[in-house]
Swiss-Prot record:
Residues 115-124, 190-211, 298-327, 390-435 are cytoplasmic. The chain crosses the membrane at residues 94-114, 125-145, 169-189, 212-229, 277-297, 328-348, 369-389. It is found in: Cell membrane. Receptor for two functionally unrelated ligands; SP (A70A) for controlling reproductive behaviors and MIP for controlling sleep behavior. MIP-SPR pathway functions as a sleep homeostat which perceives the need for sleep and stabilizes it by providing a slow-acting inhibitory input to the fly arousal system that involve the pigment dispersing factor (pdf) neurons. SP-SPR is one of the multiple SP pathways that induce female post-mating behavioral responses (PMR) such as the suppression of mating receptivity and initiation of egg laying. Keywords: Cell membrane, G-protein coupled receptor, Membrane, Receptor, Transducer, Transmembrane, Transmembrane helix. It is a multi-pass membrane protein. InterPro entries: 7TM_GPCR_serpentine_rcpt_Srw, GPCR1-related_rcpt, GPCR_Rhodpsn, GPCR_Rhodpsn_7TM. Residues 1-93, 146-168, 230-276, 349-368 are extracellular. It holds the Pfam family 7TM_GPCR_Srw. GO terms for cellular component: plasma membrane. In the female, expressed in the reproductive organs; strongly expressed in the spermathecae and the lower oviduct. No expression in the male reproductive organs. In the central nervous system of both sexes, it is expressed in the brain and ventral nerve cord (VNC); strongly expressed in the ventral regions of the suboesophageal ganglion, the cervical connective and in many nerve roots of the brain and VNC. Expressed in the s-LNvs and l-LNvs pdf neurons (at protein level). This is Sex peptide receptor. Its main location: membrane.
Length: 435
């Protein structure tokens, strides 16, 4: 099930075939000098993991037919087979560069504003970490996507071997690691806000800046350890072919021997993807949906209490409750936008696992397209957070204006300011201010 490619996730699988069908290769005589590719004729298959004599990456290349073939039944890596070109070219080649620029600008502004001393709060620290990870998720694969799809080099065999390794690291492993950190930070953000709103006394102990920093470091470490085997589970062997009339060294992909000898291909990939679908996709989404519902219910109760305080003319407490509700609402919106982009990925990933391990029912050609679209909309959601912060956080807007328009443009009445998560930093006290 080694199917991770492109920005975040990309399956190149289809209904499984018999071992005889798996080993069937296109006639090498069909290969023409210069390696002219047909238009997107990739064949998508699921290997028989019971037959461990068949090396998985070898098989993955062989099923591509002519676009993966080389003489003497040796295949090499070419990206034309990895993605449906009718979708990959417009999404990755033409739209993604614009999204990359917008994401870099918007998330850089978020980091710049949230890193100011006046914005230094525990949850702002988590929001800043999310912005950095989302930005890196897009930056790492950008050079490869531009080269392959924007500049139209997808039909060429990837070479030399060092380029194959770099492409795998920056287009598969690093984006997956950064996205995993972002998912877990989003979960930490929701848990932290739930503690603030529903268990305020605990926030004094658990939601301090040192604890949040340690938690962020642990999350980054766990995400790195989760992806660490992926740096070493494949071996790229040099293979010389004739390309455009000249010898060219390309990549022949094999599963590393330590996977075969100590774990087994079946167990290795099953464990990796089961962990990912459970702890990166399904469980975080389920917990986030639950916390969002609980936070919304708590916010409704606080709104009723605010009306009571207003009738009793207790304006100071009324203002504190209003600001807390505004902060909670903003974080609910941030998490909801994340869930809208993440849940489809979780669903398709779970369906892929079930179809591969239990009962085969998934149309992998359609799943390929769905994953590409969900990847695209996930990246599309990244710049939206900047608009949410500007629209729903007064102090974010004030700090932004102070940075770019000067202090004269910033309003002087700090008593009405509230931070993204922790209330006002001067006159108004909330449960979060004392942290």
């Amino acid at each position: 099930m080694d199917n991770y490619t492109d920005v975040l996730y990309q399956y190149r699988l289809a209904p499984s075939a018999s071992p005889e069908m798996e080993m069937e290769l296109a006639d090498p005589r069909q290969m023409v000098r210069g390696f002219h590719l047909p238009t997107n004729e990739s064949q998508l298959e699921i290997p028989d993991y019971g037959n461990e004599s068949l090396d998985y990456p070898n098989y993955q290349q062989m099923v591509g037919g002519p676009c993966r073939m080389e003489d003497n039944n040796i295949s090499y890596w070419n990206l034309t087979c990895d993605s449906p070109l009718e979708y990959a070219m417009p999404l990755y080649g033409y739209c993604m560069p614009f999204l990359l620029i917008i994401t870099i600008i918007s998330n850089s502004l978020i980091v710049l504003v949230l890193s100011k001393k006046s914005m230094a709060t525990p949850t702002n620290f988590v929001l800043m970490g999310m912005a950095i990870c989302d930005m890196l998720t897009v930056i790492f694969p950008a050079p490869g996507l531009w080269y392959m799809y924007t500049f139209g080099n997808h039909y060429k065999p990837l070479h030399p071997v060092s380029m194959c390794l770099a492409y795998s690291i920056f287009n598969e492993i690093m984006p997956a690691m950064c996205h995993t950190i972002s998912v877990w930070l989003t979960l930490a953000l929701a848990v932290q806000r739930y503690i603030y709103v529903c268990h305020a006394p605990m926030a004094r102990t658990w939601c301090t800046m040192p604890r949040v920093r340690r938690c962020t470091a642990y999350i980054a470490l766990l995400a790195f350890l989760h992806q660490l085997p992926r740096f070493f589970d494949r071996t790229y062997m040099p293979l010389v072919i004739e390309w455009n009339g000249s010898p060219t060294e390309v990549c022949h992909l094999e599963t590393s021997m330590w996977v075969h000898d100590y774990i087994g291909v079946d167990l290795y990939y099953t464990s990796y993807y089961l962990f990912r679908v459970l702890f990166v996709h399904l469980l975080p989404c389920i917990i986030l949906v639950t916390l969002n519902i609980l936070l919304f219910a708590a916010m409704r109760q606080a709104q009723e209490r605010r009306k009571l305080l207003f009738r009793e003319n207790r304006k100071k407490e009324c203002k504190k409750l209003r600001e807390t509700n505004c902060t909670t609402l903003m974080l609910i919106v941030v998490v909801s936008v994340f869930l809208l982009a993440e849940i489809p990925i979780a669903v398709v990933t779970a369906m892929h696992i079930v179809s591969s391990l239990i009962i085969e029912f998934l149309d992998y050609g359609l799943a390929n397209i769905c994953i590409m679209l969900t990847n695209f909309f996930l990246v599309f959601s990244y710049p939206i957070n900047f608009g949410i912060y500007c629209g729903m956080s007064r102090q974010f807007r004030e700090t932004f204006k102070e940075i770019f328009l000067g202090r004269l443009m910033a309003k002087k009445d700090s008593s009405t300011k509230y931070s993204i998560v922790n209330g006002a930093r001067t006159c108004t006290n909330t449960n979060e201010t004392v942290l």
